[in-house]
Amino acid sequence: MDKGAQSYRRFLDGDDDALGEIVDMYREGLILFIYRYVENLADAEDLAEDVFVELIVNPERYGFRSSLKTYIFTLGRNKAVDFVRKQSKIRPVQDPEERLAELADLHTLESHIIRGEENRRLYEALDSIKEDYRTALHLVYLEELSYKEAAGVMKKTPKQLENLVGRGKKAVRELMGEEGI
């Protein structure tokens, strides 16, 4: 049982501090992951909060069949996709100045994760590739999920995920003009 699942088990047994540990472990990564879908920091934070509320309100849905991180990121993905689907019908195009301000806020959140010029170039390249490639690379390399766990989040087979990661790395290399990531 992974550390997150152990903390969740303690929470279910009445240890309220364990929920704080779970939030501390996964909150920032989950917000960054959801942000890739919704492209709005406030919405990403709200959806991440909804994921943690889901853990409290519906504990029976987890079932300890996968790692807690996989379950949390699957919930995050589902909530983000639902949100984007609903918003695409009603949301006007975002003001560019507002978008820049959000990106500045996001940079503050990411500042301890992303360092240096190479990482900036890498993220620009990641933003330019197909959504499935970007999601696969994010889950495997930034969130450090196994191929099996990441495949579960994306509703793909491990082989399909392996192909997405390979193609994503190739696309990023081509965009960066380098031979290695």
What is each of the regions a protein language model found here?
Residues 60-64, 74-95, 115:
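Arg/Lys-rich amphipathic alpha helix in sigma70-family domain 2
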Residues 1-29, 170, 174, 181:
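N-terminal module of bacterial RNA polymerase sigma factors
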Residues 81, 125, 133, 142, ...:
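DNA-recognition helix of helix-turn-helix
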Residues 51, 75, 137, 149-151, ...:
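Hydrophobic positions on the alpha-helical face of helix-turn-helix-like DNA-binding modules
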Residues 90-115, 146:
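Internal acidic/polar
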Residues 23-41, 58, 126, 171, ...:
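Amphipathic, Lys/Arg- and hydrophobic-enriched alpha-helical face
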Residues 32, 46-53, 66-78:
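Structural recognition of an alpha-helix C-terminal capping motif at a helix-to-coil junction
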Residues 12-13, 39-40, 50-67:
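Sigma70-family region 2
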